[in-house]
């Protein structure tokens, strides 16, 4: 077992910076050495389907016409085949593509023949929004590593979508490049003419290049998807199935430099007991993107505005665990794949830790105090890329500023660093990698009693495919260490991630400790291709493993074993276009072997010929003996009772003007004493080709007979009362989005989510014999009023976003967000009409933001 107890994790901000700067400084030198090596040879098993790019002496005019000289000489790519719904079928209409290039750009002209051009579906939307529209997509593997690539897609209305592909099939939909495309609908069908600057993609330095390439076409009205070369859904991966693009000679290797300065004006009003608090702020910042080499890019940002366009979803968390929130900030979203560790992009690096809400705001007692929702990011930089040898590199460094209210620190200045490297072998079929994260906080005496001062985590991961890509092995070994005062480490030991103080845990709880270390082991084996797939995995998290300073970890002290099997019918049959069935078995234990969870699951999915979908999932929890080690929130483990669940999702044909969907779930447990049912209808209405409205509703009724209520007394003492109650909870929320697109460069989006949940606690009990076989013997009555613990929580989040790309890469955003909260009326009483009326009458907080950026390309 890997131990970190003797590792000195202490490091200062200066040392952190030096580590990152050293990496940034040395990698390009190594890159030049590696780039001089020959490109990786492909194995004989790789498809030889290829196309040749024609050199262009004069750049074509990007207008969607094929009257430029290059299109007269370039060889046409033909032979597109259907891959969905039928694999290797004959296409309804022909498709052709021609490819040219010069030292600065790739040029691609595509002709989508259609016998009925007046029936071509062409919908206008914001950039990167997928609609039920015709589409042509160009996928380019410029490293020719069969694992990564860039995707450029457009529909007949000229709406652009672009992605970065990694791990052979995963997509980073947030990647945005600056490129041109023009489309036209004519008597033969429609066309798309692309200009893709080589500065926007990455490739090794060489006299002659071979890129991987695939072109796909969607014909929505016939529910058909075609590709060249043929993409086989029965095989694992996408980039590994690309054809070859040859003939690329003399490509430039520019040291790309892009600068995007911006100005932001922000006005905030927040309700206070004595009125409204108002603040206005103007800031200036900028983003920089520099091509250190042809395949390494440095991104930097100074004084960034990292506002979220949509608010996080409203919810009331009654569990012991932190809520995971999705990242929506472009700087951190782009390049996510490089920082993924063994397929998990969050356990070691959860980017929302950077700029998080102040952690010590609860120390401020003044109700009129202005407490910011986020911590300012003073600056951030990252270096990412992939070398000719198959080495992927990613480093990130960020500094957030100190936040204080008066003399009370609510968030310290913090330095963050992430270093990730991985090496591919066997043309990407195998690989090993390593990752290290570092956090350092500048704490005063009060904050040092609550927050950890230093944190380091790291690990190695590996993957290996064999049997012509049908089978895979993967694994990782990680370790962590955190340091701080005895007070801060004691809080760490007692939080829900660890619960060292649980009386029957048998863990070495020590309130005088000033550090904790731990390890993580993961092993996986899978059959990943073919009609039948299956696999198994084992993971162990030691009690002291801790990554939450820069990662996301809900629970340590856990072993998980799981197995699954799946059968997929990818060819159309009499009753469906495609269908699948999966079975799962999962068992969890503490690190010391106490069984905590087991569940068995069956999932069924069908897509019918009319494009309707139906999925049904059913699972049973804790049919075998298990003990919940988190239910008593630091108390003893409680015998878990079985529950049975069913989830149904029904989706309509996505092509009509009105598209309804429905999801419903039902749960019964605690021998019928606990029930939950939830229904979520959703409808999308597209009244015009550029106007859509989405409305969703969620209603939930939860009767939980074993809801944790509280612990009275010192946790772990003989006199502690571990209290549980019956919770009767109702929840109602609405989600609405309105999208209007005036042009491909100008759009308006409105978002609103009113949220209401109420709950009453009754039948209060305390643990008596928590591991008793009989449910009735585990608890005994406890006499204490519960009325004060009832709740009525109401929230409203709205946002209006106007986005105008007034020139390529340059945008103006106008954003208005509003929030309303109310929790002090009608506790325990559920009356939606009354409650939403009260909510809309509550005083709002408002934020109006205007941001303008200007993209400069050198």
PLM regions with names:
Residues 225-227, 311-314, 405-407, 444-448, ...:
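Short acidic, glycine/serine/threonine-rich loops at helix termini
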Residues 32-424, 429-434, 842-845:
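Structural preference for beta-rich elements and adjacent junctions enriched in aromatics
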Residues 58, 104, 114, 146, ...:
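Short coil turns and loop connectors of transmembrane beta-barrels in diderm outer membranes
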Residues 275-276, 287, 319, 371, ...:
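Alpha-helix capping and helix-loop boundary segments enriched in small/acidic/polar residues
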Residues 252-299, 416-507, 574, 579-584, ...:
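Surface-exposed extracellular loop regions of Gram-negative outer-membrane beta-barrel proteins
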Residues 376, 472-474, 478-858:
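Exposed, low-structure sequence patches enriched in small/polar residues
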Residues 15-28:
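Bacterial N-terminal signal peptides
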Residues 1-13:
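N-terminal secretory signal peptides that target proteins for export/translocation
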């Amino acid at each position: 077992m890997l131990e970190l107890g003797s590792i000195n994790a202490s490091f200062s901000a200066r040392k952190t910076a030096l580590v990152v700067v050293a990496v940034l400084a040395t990698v390009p030198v190594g890159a030049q050495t590696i780039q001089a090596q020959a490109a990786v040879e492909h194995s004989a098993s790789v498809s030889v389907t290829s196309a040749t790019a024609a050199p262009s002496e004069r750049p074509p005019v990007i207008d969607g016409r094929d009257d430029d000289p290059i299109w007269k000489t370039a060889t046409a790519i033909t032979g597109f085949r259907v891959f969905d719904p039928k694999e290797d079928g004959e296409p309804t209409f022909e498709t052709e593509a021609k490819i040219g290039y010069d030292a600065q750009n790739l040029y691609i002209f595509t002709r989508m023949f259609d016998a009925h051009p007046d029936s071509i579906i062409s919908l206008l939307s914001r950039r990167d929004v997928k609609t039920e529209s015709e589409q042509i997509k160009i996928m380019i593997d410029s490293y020719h590593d069969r694992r990564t690539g860039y995707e450029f897609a457009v529909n007949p209305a000229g709406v652009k979508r672009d992605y970065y592909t990694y791990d052979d099939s995963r997509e980073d939909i947030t990647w945005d490049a600056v490129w041109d495309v023009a489309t036209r609908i004519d008597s033969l069908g429609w066309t798309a003419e692309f200009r893709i600057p080589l500065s926007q993609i990455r490739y090794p330095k060489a006299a002659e290049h071979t890129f991987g390439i695939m072109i796909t076409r969607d014909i929505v009205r016939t529910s058909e998807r075609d590709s060249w070369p043929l993409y086989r859904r029965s095989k694992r991966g996408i980039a590994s199935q690309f054809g070859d693009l040859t003939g690329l000679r003399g490509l430039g290797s520019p040291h790309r430099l892009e600068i995007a300065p911006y100005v932001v004006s922000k006005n905030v009003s927040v309700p206070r007991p004595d009125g409204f608090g108002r603040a206005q702020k103007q800031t200036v910042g900028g983003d920089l993107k520099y091509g250190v080499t042809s395949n390494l890019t440095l991104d930097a940002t100074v004084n960034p505005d990292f506002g979220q366009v949509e608010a996080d979803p409203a919810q009331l968390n009654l569990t012991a665990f932190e809520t995971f929130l999705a990242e929506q900030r472009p700087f951190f979203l782009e390049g996510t794949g490089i920082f993924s560790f063994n397929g998990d992009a969050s356990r070691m690096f959860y980017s929302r830790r950077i700029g998080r809400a102040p952690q010590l705001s609860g120390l401020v007692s003044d109700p009129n105090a202005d407490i910011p929702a986020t911590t300012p990011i003073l600056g951030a930089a990252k270096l990412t890329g992939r070398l000719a040898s198959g080495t992927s590199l990613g480093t990130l460094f960020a500094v957030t500023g100190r936040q204080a209210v008066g003399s009370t620190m609510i968030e310290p200045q913090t330095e963050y660093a992430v270093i990730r490297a991985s090496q591919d072998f066997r043309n990407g079929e195998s690989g090993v990698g390593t990752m290290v994260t570092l956090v350092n906080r500048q704490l005063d005496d009060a904050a040092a009693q609550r927050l950890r001062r230093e944190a380091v985590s790291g690990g190695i991961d590996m993957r290996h495919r064999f049997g012509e890509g049908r089978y895979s092995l993967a694994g990782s070994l990680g370790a962590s260490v955190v340091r701080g005062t005895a007070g801060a480490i004691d809080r760490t030991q007692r939080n829900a991630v660890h619960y060292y103080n649980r009386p029957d845990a048998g863990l070495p709880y020590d309130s005088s400790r000033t550090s904790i270390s731990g390890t993580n082991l993961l092993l996986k084996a899978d059959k990943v291709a073919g009609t039948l797939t299956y696999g198994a995995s084992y993971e162990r998290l030691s009690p002291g493993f801790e990554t939450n300073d820069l990662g996301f970890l809900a629970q340590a002290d856990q072993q998980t074993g799981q197995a699954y099997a799946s059968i997929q019918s990818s060819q159309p049959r009499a009753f469906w276009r495609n269908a699948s069935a999966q079975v799962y078995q999962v068992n969890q234990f503490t690190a010391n072997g106490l069984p905590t969870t087991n569940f068995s699951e069956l999932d069924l999915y069908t897509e019918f010929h009319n494009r309707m979908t139906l999925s049904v999932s059913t699972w049973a929890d804790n049919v075998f003996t298990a003990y919940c080690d988190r239910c008593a929130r630091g108390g003893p483990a409680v015998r878990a009772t079985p529950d049975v669940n069913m989830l149904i999702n029904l989706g309509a044909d996505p092509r009509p003007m009105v598209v309804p969907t429905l999801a419903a779930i039902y749960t019964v447990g605690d021998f019928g004493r606990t029930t939950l049912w939830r229904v979520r209808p959703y409808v999308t209405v597209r009244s015009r080709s550029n106007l859509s409205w989405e409305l969703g509703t969620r209603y939930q009724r939860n009767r939980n007979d074993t809801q944790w209520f509280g612990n009275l007394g010192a946790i772990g003492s003989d006199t502690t009362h571990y209290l549980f109650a019956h919770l009767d909870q109702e929840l109602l929320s609405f989600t609405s989005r309105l999208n209007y697109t005036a042009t491909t460069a100008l759009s308006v989006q409105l978002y609103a989510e009113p949220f209401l949940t109420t709950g009453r606690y009754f039948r209060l009990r305390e643990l008596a014999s928590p591991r008793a076989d009989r449910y009735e013997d585990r608890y005994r009555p406890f006499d204490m009023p519960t009325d004060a613990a009832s709740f009525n929580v109401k929230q409203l989040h709205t946002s209006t976003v106007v986005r105008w790309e007034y020139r390529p890469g340059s945008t103006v955003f106008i954003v208005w967000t509003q929030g309303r909260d109310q929790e002090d009326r009608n506790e325990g009483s559920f009356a939606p009409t009354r409650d939403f009326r009260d909510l809309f009458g509550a005083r709002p907080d408002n934020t109006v933001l205007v941001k303008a950026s200007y993209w400069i390309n050198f």
